[in-house]
Amino acid sequence: AALAETYGVPLVLHNVAGPICHAACMHLGAHIPNLFFVESVRAFYRSYFPILSTMEVAVSNGHLPVPSGPGLGVTLRETA
């Protein structure tokens, strides 16, 4: 990220994993000044993520909030 920032190159984080990786990308991205976007599979927000966690992803004007709460802000379902 620092090398990209030095040369004015935007950085993109890529996540096609689960809610833990998504939360980690959001927290990391919040601290990268040259972040362009976090790429993810939006269909997972309503299908895959609710099976594994209680995390609710709310897209607002193309933006995602950084999860809050202890740790990364993700609570896994024990039944998953």
Which residues fall in each region the model found?
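Intrinsic disorder at enzyme termini
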Residues: 79-80
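Charged, cofactor-coupling segments
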Residues: 76
